[in-house]
Amino acid sequence: MARITPIARYRNIGISAHIDAGKTTTTERILFYTGVNHKIGEVHNGAATMDWMAQEQERGITITSAATTCFWAGMAKQFDSHRINIIDTPGHVDFTIEVERSMRVLDGAVMVYCAVGGVQPQSETVWRQANKYKVPRIAFVNKMDRMGANYLRVVEQLKTRLAANPVPIQLAIGAEEKFTGVVDLVKMKAINWSEADQGVTFTYEDIPADLTELADKWHQHLVESAAEASEELMDKYLGGEELTEEEIKHGLRQRVLNNEIILVTCGSAFKNKGVQAMLDAVIEYLPAPTDVAAINGVLEDGETHAERHSSDEEPFSALAFKIATDPFVGNLTFFRVYSGVVNSGDTVLNSVKDKRERFGRIVQMHANKREEIKEVRAGDIAAAIGLKDVTTGDTLCDTSAPIILERMEFPEPVISVAVEPKTKADQEKMGLALGRLAQEDPSFRVWTDEESGQTIIAGMGELHLEILVDRMRREFNVEANVGKPQVAYRETIRSIVEQEGKFVRQSGGRGQFGHVWLRIEPMEPGGKGYEFLNEIVGGVVPKEYVPAVDKGVQEQLKSGVLAGYPIVDVRVAAFDGSYHEVDSSEMAFKIAGSMAFKEGFMKAKPVLLEPIMKVEVETPEDYMGDVIGDLNRRRGMIDGMEDTTTGKTVRAQVPLSEMFGYATDLRSQTQGRASYSMEFLKYNEAPNNVAQAIIETRRAK
């Protein structure tokens, strides 16, 4: 089957924003204007197409990023039909993992900001992730019809808070309830959308007289930015010649693709204004799969560099970026095709696990409605039903041309709770449910505590775990009691020691003999976390026994020495020892390694590390003193303060253990007028008195 839409007319984009910037509403409007659904779903009625899990509709927040396909030929039908694949990403900080995954498979992004709230904390996180994957982006300043809306203030914040280089391609005509349309700064015309047909038709008009001066100033800024794209445009501009509309657009597109500028548009999705022009900007300025550099990977040996270009002619390669459980068909694996073609029924290789998988059925999702398709090609995003053993980040490729595309890296969870099934019947279902959820979400871990026998689940924040427990109840009918949240502490050391470990059992018959010297030293935090070096020379310990020493050390790392928390950032070198011809065994050396590490660890100035969170509180000025005082009481370090339209933003670093129940306390301190967000920042050494208390509590158990 031939390709229906040429790959140059594909746009794979993400729509990304802070909670309440109106991102889901914006996506709904896109689906409406591109003719997919004929009745607009409002988020505050709980009817939006993209938010399809029951909890999302209740809480009004987006949790899973649904992928959707639509077609757009421009608001004046000025383009050939373009295929836009949209990935809707969640805005809550406990779900940054979802955002990270989507960024990985996108070619471009639309960042939605609220005209009142501006650039909020989560926007910064998403911005950093987009920078990490070098995703070209444009901004849409939404909610221009709301009280306190100020478009140019948001443009300024993009510069100051995100260190971006914003270039507005539109100006707002009026604001708040007087917001009527936008000025197109490229064409230098005003755009007015018809209210009668929900903004489907529009007219170009002259720019209102009170805006002409401002429009000229920003038009100049825009032309200058476009001219910087190439020497020939610059020469033409400096020579005093007018740049044509085509040249301006071409220059801006080049600079967006190079991540040098971010174009800013505005509107009100709720009032059906501006989304149409933003869609045109997606087509004109964001990249097609062919505009993006080839994706990098390695061959089977794990070292040889290889790449795949966006072309149907190259061998098939795709990246699984999300696993979802669907009530009707079981596992859905969302994947992005980077090169080649695959048909339903084909067998492909999961090169990360080295297992073959058969594509049973392939579906394309429109929010949670699905359409079966027979084939997918380079640039497509689709979901496969029935893949057995694929997890997020795995590569699917042609069996005759294996390649491993870059793996995604996922953060370690920082908070854990114990869950207990309420009845015997729940117990069996719970294991299955947790397994499914962990497969879908790599930032969620499940394990059994060996001492207490309890099932422990860990994730990125309180809301993350609440929603997982809630999903367990709704989707799998498992009722569970949830314990108090526990902090994921870590242990490490501060000095270097050398330590001997000797395990000898010789009392007639076959004995045991293992003897090893280890050097234990601290490593830079944030690196590999653990490294083992074999420095044994002259065969004093035969090399087949050295891996056993490493294994002994690694077992000890899992449950630390100080208080049983995992040990991180240590380097261990085996440099000496001895063995016995008959009595030595792997088991003996494993125990010797474990003993040496345990003793050495306690001599190497062991310390307890605690997770530190980056906290931002937005509060009316009257409560500022109380909020700061409270953060100080929680051992917080204030990083800085900023004025916002509604008061002040306080930024601080606070240990996670002090943040439990903060939402309730903050509400009572500020009569519910303040809001906060937090995300994991780093691990820091816990102060002595805190560490002692934790160690004693753990030992008492």
UniProtKB/Swiss-Prot annotation:
One of its GO terms (biological process) is ribosome disassembly. GO terms for cellular component: cytoplasm. Keywords: Cytoplasm, Elongation factor, GTP-binding, Nucleotide-binding, Protein biosynthesis. Residues 8-290 form the tr-type G domain. Gene3D superfamilies: 3.30.230.10, 3.30.70.240, Elongation Factor G (Translational Gtpase), domain 3 (3.30.70.870), P-loop containing nucleotide triphosphate hydrolases (3.40.50.300), Translation factors (2.40.30.10). InterPro entries: EFG_II, EFG_III, EFG_III/V, EFG_IV, EFG_V, EFG_V-like, EFTu-like_2, G_TR_CS. Coiled coil: none annotated. The keyword NAD does not apply. SMART domains: EFG_C, EFG_IV. The keyword Nucleotide-binding applies. GTP binds at residues 17-24, 88-92, 142-145. It holds the Pfam family EFG_III. It is found in: Cytoplasm. One of its GO terms (molecular function) is translation elongation factor activity. Catalyzes the GTP-dependent ribosomal translocation step during translation elongation. During this step, the ribosome changes from the pre-translocational (PRE) to the post-translocational (POST) state as the newly formed A-site-bound peptidyl-tRNA and P-site-bound deacylated tRNA move to the P and E sites, respectively. Catalyzes the coordinated movement of the two tRNA molecules, the mRNA and conformational changes in the ribosome. Belongs to the TRAFAC class translation factor GTPase superfamily. Classic translation factor GTPase family. EF-G/EF-2 subfamily. This is Elongation factor G.
